[in-house]
A protein has these predicted regions:
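Membrane-interface transmembrane helices that cradle and orient dolichyl/undecaprenyl
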Residues: 48-71, 100-109
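Aromatic-rich transmembrane-lumenal/periplasmic boundary elements in polytopic membrane proteins
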Residues: 135-168
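Transmembrane-embedded, aromatic-rich helix segments that form part
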Residues: 87-105
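Membrane-interfacial entry segments at the cytosolic side of transmembrane helices
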Residues: 69, 110-131
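Short helix- or helix-capping micro-motifs
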Residues: 15-23, 50, 78, 82
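Transmembrane-helix signature of polytopic, membrane-embedded enzymes
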Residues: 2-24, 59-69
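Transmembrane-helix signature of membrane-embedded glycosylation machinery that interfaces
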Residues: 1-10, 49-56, 139
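Short acidic/glycine- and proline-prone juxtamembrane loop motifs at membrane-interface regions
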Residues: 30-40, 86-87
Length: 168
């Protein structure tokens, strides 16, 4: 949280204040003691948001070419958030708004070569925010396959539909 607040405000005291506030809140301790997995989802959602803010700031300063690292790290964090709990998928909507918003802001800067950057951002967005998270989500089911080598995509799909119907 310290890094996130510091990146947003560029002030050390704001980072310290955010860190102190998160340390003073006992929700994460309570949730970990009652064995809910929300703390994992929350961590990866915040990590993905941190990398998206870094990406947005980097795009406005360096362009899309110089911003692939935060984009890739954000996609990995998003994938881990989705793999730990479906709530991470909903957080993806917020990430998409930031992602599209920074592309709009970059377009408003009237930089030459914007459409080349836009194509790179679109390919990077699909690769890092759709393909990589999906592969991470699939990898989270490897223990099923290790236990039962006949576990296939149909079984994986049945797990998804069962989770959906259980929660709806």
């Amino acid at each position: 949280m310290w890094c996130f607040a510091r990146r947003l405000t560029h002030k050390r005291w704001a980072g310290a204040m955010a860190g102190a506030l998160i340390a003073a809140g006992f929700m994460r301790f309570s949730q970990s003691r009652i064995a809910t997995i929300d703390i994992y989802g929350t961590f990866f959602i915040l990590l993905g948001a941190y990398f998206m803010v870094w990406y947005c700031q980097s795009v406005l300063q360096n362009g899309v070419d110089g911003s692939l690292l935060p984009m890739a790290l954000g996609g990995v964090a998003f994938g881990l958030g989705c793999a730990s709990k479906w709530t991470g998928i909903y957080a993806g909507a917020g990430l998409a708004v930031l992602y599209l918003g920074v592309l709009y802001a970059r377009w408003k800067q009237k930089q030459p070569g914007f459409w080349k950057e836009f194509r790179m951002a679109a390919v990077g967005g699909v690769a890092f925010y759709i393909v990589v998270p999906f592969l991470i989500y699939l990898a989270s089911y490897l223990p099923y396959w290790w236990k039962d080598p006949t576990f296939g995509l149909r079984d994986w799909w049945d797990c998804q539909t069962y989770m959906y119907w259980y929660h709806s």
